[in-house]
Amino acid sequence: MSFVIAAPEVIAAAATDLASLGSSISAANAAAAANTTALMAAGADEVSTAIAALFGAHGQAYQALSAQAQAFHAQFVQALTSGGGAYAAAEAAAVSPLLDPINEFFLANTGRPLIGNGANGAPGTGANGGDGGWLIGNGGAGGSGAAGVNGGAGGNGGAGGNGGAGGLIGNGGAGGAGGVASSGIGGSGGAGGNAMLFGAGGAGGAGGGVVALTGGAGGAGGAGGNAGLLFGAAGVGGAGGFTNGSALGGAGGAGGAGGLFATGGVGGSGGAGSSGGAGGAGGAGGLFGAGGTGGHGGFADSSFGGVGGAGGAGGLFGAGGEGGSGGHSLVAGGDGGAGGNAGMLALGAAGGAGGIGGDGGTLTAGGIGGAGGAGGNAGLLFGSGGSGGAGGFGFADGGQGGPGGNAGTVFGSGGAGGNGGVGQGFAGGIGGAGGTPGLIGNGGNGGNGGASAVTGGNGGIGGTGVLIGNGGNGGSGGIGAGKAGVGGVSGLLLGLDGFNAPASTSPLHTLQQNVLNVVNEPFQTLTGRPLIGNGANGTPGTGADGGAGGWLFGNGANGTPGTGAAGGAGGWLFGNGGNGGHGATNTAATATGGAGGAGGILFGTGGNGGTGGIATGAGGIGGAGGAGGVSLLIGSGGTGGNGGNSIGVAGIGGAGGRGGDAGLLFGAAGTGGHGAAGGVPAGVGGAGGNGGLFANGGAGGAGGFNAAGGNGGNGGLFGTGGTGGAGTNFGAGGNGGNGGLFGAGGTGGAAGSGGSGITTGGGGHGGNAGLLSLGASGGAGGSGGASSLAGGAGGTGGNGALLFGFRGAGGAGGHGGAALTSIQQGGAGGAGGNGGLLFGSAGAGGAGGSGANALGAGTGGTGGDGGHAGVFGNGGDGGCRRVWRRYRRQRWCRRQRRADRQRRQRRQRRQSRGHARCRRHRRAAARRERTQRLAIAGRPATTRGVEGISCSPQMMP
């Protein structure tokens, strides 16, 4: 027997390279022929003529040898191609007879095969996807729920099926989308399947929409599947169902739990409706993984925007996830979600930042901005608290900033409070309070108050030190006579009081402050920053940047509000950066918010970017998030600022700011700010920050009304790419960030859902896994949005690890959006990503969107193509097209499978015919050569009619 192991894909690639090389050599020979085969004599004498003839003869001999070499090269390439085809045909023919008996035994005894992908649930039935093989195989996608029926107590959409579980090596299947309801409640999306050891959890299915203009509620999105125990990304939660009229938007599904090193899945976005659906909670991180980011709250057209989902809790040694931003509303913006808490034994990992409050109101009716979410708390012993989220913009009142999280009990600084939102017509939002530090650490700075033309918001209270550390600065009051917040008192042993701290009644404490002021004076004079202490806040009306923290420790100060001043850098050794000031209000030109300050070298969180200013023309651009601490240990990036709103008729909403980058070794990258809701067009979401060595990229910010979400940040060397931001209403989702060299790709953002007569945007594309990642998956594509006409297309799944991606599976394509009328079609499913070059199963194509409701039989969206597997992996299943009439659905799937089988059979027959022609060609050539030898020897011979037989490359498959 043969002991040769052949990879048909590698042989085919080698044949292609050789053919290209032969073409290049032939072109070079042809170009040189004229100058080497017919040389002109240098003179008219006989010697020159003889020399020219001699060299010309050498050139002609070379061309003759080149022609023979070219013929041999063509034969070799042909033999290599036919050999690869023969290996592929033999491999395909041998798989079924060898594997089928084994799989039948396991199916009969366990209900799932040993090797192979699980079957997809039939569309329109809500059937669960089949489980993948015990050893290798992806779980099947759950079937979509059936549409509701007219009249009576009916009208509710059917629930989508759950995705199948993955095998030991394989991804969990995506949950099916909930059915569209004619009235009542849309069907719930199915839960994504769980991976076992190596693989990504399946994405949760999107909730079904509601067609009726009055009453009802969109279906809840399904929960994302859990990641594999060792490697793989957790599944993202499904988006809540979109509704028309006065119906309520569905809640987003929770993200799946991470594996050993994986981050928890991102929560699904809430559905749009009269009241926006709440964003799903981020999934819990694995043992060393960070918690997932909470989902974006849904848009509301006549009530409250959806509340952002809470960030997931970090694993035992992981950081907390960031809270989701609140949904925009025409009345009152939704509150941002709370940041997740870090793991109990996390060494320095920070709590997650609170989500940004949603914008609320209109120019004529007023409205209230949503409150920022609270920052998450650090671990039990070490770590800083998360920053509070900024309050949302309100056409009447601005939203209140979220409070900062508390630090670990031994070491760490309190989180900074979020800035209050701008109130256009009445009052600015109050700044959030700073968090409490550990025994060693600075109190968090209070957030700046929001600006207003009538009454500015008060600044937030600074956190109080415990043993060694400065008190936090009180936040500056907002423009419009806002009062500064009260500063925090320093630690008992060492530290300076924060800005605007109350006068001490203790003589010992007063002596301590005076001594430190004397010590700091020469450092302040020579370097512009103290030795110990916080930087000074920018005075309102001066436009000054916030001062830098002390050389040893101290927080950077907040930038001057209303001028877009930058926050000060944190203390050189440890300390948090200050928040950037918001941009100027009521200006015709753009007014950019200030950038957040950088954190300390060793420990420190970057400050949050300021909100862009309000403009009568073009809205201000949101300030960039503060850079993470340039640290050898820990430093989290700040959250990007929100884009400024535009109140002019032809105004343009500002884009959200970019999140700050994480520290060199550890720390969470900042989330991009969300785009402004006001203005046409509205602002796009900001991009997430890039991760550090072991950190994941930050999530992209949500887009403003009808605007696209921001792209996720790229992961660090071992980090996962960030999740793309969700598009709002008709906007496209942002693309997921690429994984680091050894990391997984980020998940694409979900597209927003459209209203009556609107086509929605497509889901974001998943990020690619890192070049050398072992077992990492490409990110899943985002789901397309639902619409009354044509649903948005699902995003393409990211590719698995490129070079040595051991069992790196490509991401599953996103689900197409569901059309809510009977006259149009659902969105096309996204294509599955490719597996790793050597090892790895390919991603399954996304299911096409639902094509009709109970009123008729619309056309389902086309299913996405499955991805290409690696040399030792399984190819991805194509997504089925969704239609509502049962007989059409069954006939379509049968035709699809039959067409695939017929294509394989035709390819094998072409390969067999090509091999036969090659054998006839070789026999004919041998007979011609034998005839020539006999003719030279003077012996008669017959050719038996072999002339003219040839085997050209065109005969080969």
UniProtKB/Swiss-Prot annotation:
InterPro entries: PE-PGRS_N (IPR000084). SUPFAM superfamilies: PE/PPE dimer-like (SSF140459). Residues 893-957 are annotated as: Disordered. It is found in: Cell outer membrane; Secreted; Secreted, Cell wall; Cell surface. It holds the Pfam family PE. Signal peptide: none annotated. Induction: Specifically expressed under low phosphate concentrations. Expression is very low and undetectable under classical growth conditions but long-term exposure to low phosphate triggers its expression. Administration of free phosphate, cardiolipin and phosphatidylinositol to phosphate-starved culture turns off expression of the gene. Residues 4-94 form the PE domain. A cleavage of the protein removes the N-terminal 120-150 residues, immediately upstream the PGRS domain. The exact position of the cleavage site could not be identified. Residues 893-925 have a biased composition (Basic residues). One of its GO terms (cellular component) is cell outer membrane. It comes from the Bacteria. Keywords: Cell outer membrane, Cell wall, Membrane, Repeat, Secreted, Virulence. Its main location: membrane. The arginine-rich C-terminal region protrudes from the mycobacterial membrane and mediates M.tuberculosis entry into host epithelial cells. May serve as a bridge between mycobacteria and host cells by interacting with specific host phospholipids and extracting them from host cells, for their direct integration or as a source of phosphate, during phases of TB pathogenesis when M.tuberculosis is short of phosphate supply. The 77 amino acids long, arginine-rich C-terminal domain plays a critical role in tuberculosis pathogenesis. This positively charged helical domain specifically binds phosphorylated phosphatidylinositols and cardiolipin, whereas it is unable to bind other phospholipids. Expression in M.smegmatis enhances adhesion of M.smegmatis to murine macrophages and human alveolar epithelial cells and improves bacterial persistence in spleen tissue following infection in mice. Overexpression in M.tuberculosis improves adhesion to pneumocytes, but not to phagocytic cells. Belongs to the mycobacterial PE family. PGRS subfamily. This is PE-PGRS family protein PE_PGRS3.
